[in-house]
Design a protein with these regions (language model features):
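Amphipathic alpha-helical scaffolding segments comprising HEAT/armadillo-like alpha-solenoid repeats
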Residues: 1, 8-19, 40-50, 136-149, ...
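Structural detector for internal amphipathic alpha-helices that build alpha-solenoid repeat scaffolds
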Residues: 1-6, 28-37, 126-132, 158-169, ...
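Long hydrophobic alpha-helices with heptad-repeat/coiled-coil character
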Residues: 3, 21-33, 209, 227, ...
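Cytosolic small-GTPase signaling regions in large eukaryotic proteins
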Residues: 3-5, 20-21, 28-73, 230-232, ...
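Alpha-helix N-cap/helix-start positions at coil->helix boundaries
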Residues: 9, 24-28, 154-155, 171, ...
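Extended repeat-based scaffolds of very large eukaryotic assembly and lipid-transport proteins
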Residues: 46-186, 256-257, 261-276
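C-terminal structured domains
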Residues: 188-195, 223, 227-230, 236-276
């Protein structure tokens, strides 16, 4: 991503033929990179490079690519979901509007969308699901998906069932995942634990970041602890904070006011609890 944004002309020149070529993974990756570049202000450059070919069909193909509905921006080939994907026996996502559960057909589509690459941006269809369904039911569904993946032997090619926790997870997800992250290095699963740190960061809530910071503060597996420290530093930088400032914001306030006091109200009697 950094290289593409630094050298957009070279990148577009190299990517264009693949983006307009044979359907497949190479085309999907090239188109995703071009979309990222256009979203970062390089659409005029893309159109200029297309015109250099002096071929109307190239210009037309690029214009068609730019006009593509965001919901159509998904891999050309959608593989069959794995055998462990059995959503009919899991917690079902519930609609906010009427508390109805999603039907099997919608759960099939949800599984397919969770498989789509999410590196550059979340697929718009998933944003629609998050807007339509309750956060807690989505988190429970995704946890069931994750545990099914673990029970199936955690196949690496289906790791989307793990990283989906970062897409649809919540505070409870972070609390349940953290003990596993802490234990995995001792089970020769350092790489999985590292992905777990990424998931906590992706959830991004104060509770999730508190869990991440707890790993950064204390863990017997030092390589993972250092990686957690790096994640906290990156998050602090993205928020224009120092690490100390971020940690201060993540510290639980225990219900205290700015003076470090808590008012206990028992009707006719009140007590103030203060901490030095």
């Amino acid at each position: 991503r950094t290289w593409l944004l630094k050298y957009p002309e070279h990148a577009i020149t190299g990517l264009l033929s693949a983006a307009l070529g044979k359907a497949g993974e190479a085309q999907d990756n090239a188109r995703a990179a071009l979309r990222m570049l256009t979203e970062n202000g390089h659409q005029p450059l893309l159109q200029e490079i297309a015109r250099r070919y002096n071929q109307p069909e190239v210009t037309d193909a690029v214009n068609a690519l730019l006009a593509l509905d965001p919901l159509d921006n998904h891999p050309t080939k959608i593989p069959t979901l794995p055998a462990f994907y059995q959503p009919s026996i899991w917690t079902r996502p519930v609609l906010k509007a009427n508390a109805q559960s999603l039907p099997d057909s919608a759960l099939l589509r949800l599984g397919e969308m969770l498989r789509f690459p999410q590196e550059e941006a979340l697929y718009p269809g998933l944003l629609q699901v998050k807007a339509a369904c309750t956060a807690d039911s989505l988190a429970e569904f995704t946890w069931d998906l994750f545990t099914a993946w673990l029970a199936a032997g955690a196949p690496s090619k289906e790791s989307w069932a793990f990283t989906a926790l970062g897409v649809l997870g919540n505070d409870d997800t972070a609390r349940k995942l953290t003990p596993l992250i802490r234990a995995w290095p001792g089970e020769s699963q350092h790489k999985r634990a590292t992905v777990g740190l990424d998931i906590l960061a992706a959830i991004g809530s104060d509770i999730a970041l508190m869990q991440l910071n707890g790993i950064a503060q204390k863990l017997k597996f030092k390589a993972l602890q250092e990686r957690a420290k790096e994640k906290i530093a990156d998050i602090a930088e993205s928020r224009k904070l120092t690490v100390a400032e971020l940690e201060d914001r993540l510290a639980p306030d225990l219900g205290l006011d700015d003076n470090g006091s808590l008012l206990l109200d028992f009707g006719p009697r009140q007590f103030t609890v203060s901490f030095d």
